[in-house]
A protein has these predicted regions:
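N- or domain-start disorder-to-order transition segments that initiate the globular core
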Residues: 2-52
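Charge-rich, well-structured scaffold segments of protease-associated domains
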Residues: 2-16, 64, 78, 82-273, ...
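Short acidic-hydrophobic surface loop/beta-edge motif
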Residues: 32-39, 275-285
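Short, surface-exposed beta-strand/loop micro-motifs that present aromatic residues
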Residues: 45-48, 221-224, 277-286
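Short pre-active-site segment immediately N-terminal to the catalytic Zn-binding motif
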Residues: 60-70
Length: 371
């Protein structure tokens, strides 16, 4: 049976260019957590050292969207389209085909971007980590990649190359699909209304209306601003010793300076009274509009990075909505104000906790009894 490893570093210890900031045994997880900082570049490392052959290497950046053009999402795609050391068109798909990775991905969140790879073969993990490190810090980011991933003009009919041109692009097309879903559209309307003074009110994935406003220069500047070691948070998990990760990073972080420090993300100032939002969405011309209304109440409730806040909201959500007999769920179902519940309960939006109660298949004149 796995046991919790003994600590191998001590607070204030210096190792491979890093200083140990904190060491925390985690008996429930059979792991020891090490928090470290690279002294030259300012990069931070969190390693959960456990007796587990499944090792994970992840590079993470706070990337709050500056607007609705989808810069974080487009950049996530673009950095994995060739780098200085690996100048192939799609190294991401080459890794999927050729490595023994148990997990490999890249993800854009509300306010951050993640690049995780996992493998239970150490040599394979180091190869994957080297490709990912070079991809995020030294991508090619040429105009062809920008046009392909963000937007470009293409014939509406591929068989008629001289015909009408329409906007295309990988992220553009992906987000058109997202925005065509009424429930996805509703979630974005709610976020914009709930966070008017915060990056969480902006579309990190990209609004198809705004994506064509993005310029190549803004794209390059976004990488220079956010994809710097001083803004990087490295996360490791598994039985590879901490010192090996630090040696790997220190060699590649040579020459970087702190360049300011990590990006701070502002939270939404609280209001003194509720706000009402009414928003329409398109349906097919022949589609019956009866009971196509969504009714939603949503609150800002606390700090999702505060363990107590997060736990209390999770428990409250379970008590009120967590099963068929839960009082709020039962009351909403038995009210017959809508066909079913919609995305209800505790939800994290970056650093913010929210609580939402929603119904779908309703009508506008049922709003007052719903509230």
């Amino acid at each position: 049976m796995p046991e919790m490893p003994q600590p191998t570093c001590q607070p204030a210890q210096q190792l491979h260019g890093f200083v140990v900031r904190d060491v925390t045994p985690l008996p429930a997880d059979l792991a020891v957590a090490y928090l470290l900082e690279h002294q030259a570049s300012g990069a931070t490392v969190l390693h959960l050292h456990a007796e587990d052959k499944e090792n994970c290497f992840s590079i993470n950046f706070p990337t709050p969207p500056p607007d609705d053009t989808g810069l974080p999402h487009i950049m996530e795609h673009a950095v994995l389209a060739g780098s200085e050391k690996y100048p192939v068109k799609e190294p991401f798909f080459e890794m999927i085909k050729l490595s023994m990775a148990t997990f490999i991905n890249a993800m854009t969140g509300w306010d951050c971007t993640y690049y995780p790879v996992c493998s239970n073969v150490p040599a394979d993990l180091w190869n994957l980590a080297d490709v990912y490190f070079d991809a995020v810090f030294h991508p090619l980011l040429d105009r062809t990649t920008f046009s392909r991933e963000a937007y470009h003009y293409a014939p509406a009919d591929p068989a008629d190359p001289t015909g009408e041109l329409v906007i295309s692009g990988i992220v553009y097309s992906e987000m058109k699909g997202v925005f065509s879903d009424p429930e996805q559209r509703l979630s974005r309307v709610l976020s914009r209304a709930l966070f008017p003074d915060s990056p969480y009110g902006l579309e990190s994935g990209g609004d198809p209306v705004a994506i064509p406003d993005l310029t190549y220069e803004q794209f390059r500047e976004f990488h220079r601003t956010y994809y710097h070691p001083a803004n990087a948070h490295f996360f490791f998990y598994g039985d590879i010793p901490t010192a090996e990760y630090l040696a790997f990073l220190d060699e590649r972080l040579a020459g970087y300076s702190r360049n300011g420090g990590p990006i701070e993300i502002a939270t939404q100032p609280r209001w003194s009274r509720p706000k009402d939002i009414v928003e329409g969405y398109p349906i097919e011309p022949e589609e019956d509009a009866a009971e196509k209304t969504y009714l939603v109440l949503q609150w800002l409730t606390g700090d999702s990075t505060d363990p107590l806040d997060a736990l209390l909201m999770y428990v409250l959500s379970l008590v009120l909505l967590g099963n068929e007999g839960a009082p709020l769920r039962r009351a909403l179902v038995e009210s017959h104000l809508g066909a079913d519940l919609l995305h209800s309960g505790d939800m994290h939006v970056g650093r913010e906790n929210t609580f939402r109660v929603g119904l779908k298949g309703s009508e506008e004149d049922r709003l007052e009894p719903f509230c």
